């Protein structure tokens, strides 16, 4: 999931001739949902949007307060073009989640924002509509966010599984098991360590 977050003095969304949403001071969030996004990506973005410290405090100290600290507004606008991949000069949007899946996913994120913050301070555009978005950037301050990708490389997944198995195996071993393994490794490195000891024993048995 990708987001372009802008600190604004005001922002609004117009569809046709009707202004359907507007905010004063706060954040305008353009949100691009990927076909690979899950609830973990929603949780990450909600947490970051609401806690990002891009506002000054009462003493004028910059980068000190979040939108929640100042009880400011948030305007979210669905923006599938953030998932663009260029093929030459032509944008390709196959990485974006299809609209029929993205709309409930987006609505779920809005609901989570409202549950975490004050619902009356979370505004949005109109999903799938052709919108005119007016953004009066304050600063300007523009921050690009991207949720951490889940590991999809089979080699990376296999490596992580092996590392986890080694950790579990180490935890389950007793001290004696570990000591025996170390002794076995030493004997492989220095074969004379074991053969010499056996020779001493046999020589004691000879008359």
Swiss-Prot record:
Subunit and interaction comment: Homodimer.
GO biological process, any: tRNA metabolic process
Catalytic activity: a D-aminoacyl-tRNA + H2O = a tRNA + a D-alpha-amino acid + H(+); glycyl-tRNA(Ala) + H2O = tRNA(Ala) + glycine + H(+)
Protein name, entry field: D-aminoacyl-tRNA deacylase 1
Main location: cytoplasm
UniProt motif (Gly-cisPro motif, important for rejection of L-amino acids) ranges: 139-140
Amino acid composition bias (Basic and acidic residues), ranges on this chain: 156-167, 178-189
Domain remarks: A Gly-cisPro motif from one monomer fits into the active site of the other monomer to allow specific chiral rejection of L-amino acids.
EC number: 3.1.1.96
Family of the protein in this entry: Belongs to the DTD family.
Keywords recorded for this protein, A-Z: Cytoplasm, Hydrolase, RNA-binding, tRNA-binding
GO cellular component, one term: cytoplasm
Protein role: D-aminoacyl-tRNA deacylase, with no observable activity on tRNAs charged with their cognate L-amino acid. Hydrolyzes correctly charged, achiral, glycyl-tRNA(Gly). Deacylates mischarged D.melanogaster and E.coli glycyl-tRNA(Ala), protecting cells against glycine mischarging by AlaRS. Acts via tRNA-based rather than protein-based catalysis; rejects L-amino acids rather than detecting D-amino acids in the active site.
Record keyword Disulfide bond present: no
Residue segments, region Disordered: 142-207
Molecular-function GO term, any one: D-tyrosyl-tRNA(Tyr) deacylase activity
KW Disulfide bond (keyword) present: no
Organism: Danio rerio (Zebrafish)
Subcellular localization: Cytoplasm
């Amino acid at each position: 999931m990708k987001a372009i977050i802008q600190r604004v003095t005001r922002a609004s969304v117009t569809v046709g001739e009707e202004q359907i949403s507007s905010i004063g001071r706060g954040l305008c969030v353009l949100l691009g949902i990927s076909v690979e996004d899950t609830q973990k990506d929603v949780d990450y973005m909600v947490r970051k949007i609401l806690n990002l410290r891009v506002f000054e405090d009462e003493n004028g100290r910059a980068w000190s307060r979040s939108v929640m600290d100042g009880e400011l507004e948030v305007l979210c606008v669905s923006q599938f073009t953030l998932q663009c991949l260029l093929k030459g000069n032509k944008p390709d949007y196959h990485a974006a989640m299809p609209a029929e899946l993205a709309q409930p996913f987006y609505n779920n994120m809005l609901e989570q924002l409202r549950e975490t913050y004050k619902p009356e301070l979370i505004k949005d555009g109109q999903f799938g509509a052709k919108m005119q978005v007016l953004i009066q950037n304050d600063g300007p301050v523009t921050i690009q966010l991207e949720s951490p990708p889940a590991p999809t490389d089979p080699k990376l997944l296999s490596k992580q599984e092996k590392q986890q198995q080694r950790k579990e195996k180490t935890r389950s071993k007793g001290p004696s098991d570990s000591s025996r393994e170390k002794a076995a490794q030493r004997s492989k490195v220095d074969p004379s360590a074991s053969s010499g000891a056996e020779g001493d024993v046999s020589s004691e048995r000879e008359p």
